[in-house]
Amino acid sequence: MDALQNVRVHIDKHHACRRALFETPNRASFTFDRATADASIASIEISGLRRPYECFGKMVVGDALVHVRERSAGGKIVVPVNGPADFFTAVLKNGLEFIKLDVYVAPRI
């Protein structure tokens, strides 16, 4: 659980984190509520990383599947989205160490 000890996910002020679930020592999922139905996401920020990681991920933006590859800088990774995303899954790798991360965005109920 040491790798996930300080990991945080932030989207923007139009998306509120409803649930953060740490399932195993290297797997976490975050669920966000969308404040308005048409709120688009500029970027997803993953911060609190203790080591340099490289992010390999996939997300659904609108009707398209987008592949992501970003490197961490200063303990955080900023993944540009630029649209209404519903789902983001990523594997953060550092040599043999990895973190699996899932981000779900749902309309507020």
From Swiss-Prot:
Entries under InterPro entries matching the protein: ETM (IPR035147)
Domain of life where this protein originates: Viruses
Keywords of the record: Early protein
Pfam families: ETM
The protein's name: ECORI-T site protein ETM homolog
Organism whose genome encodes this protein: Orgyia pseudotsugata multicapsid polyhedrosis virus
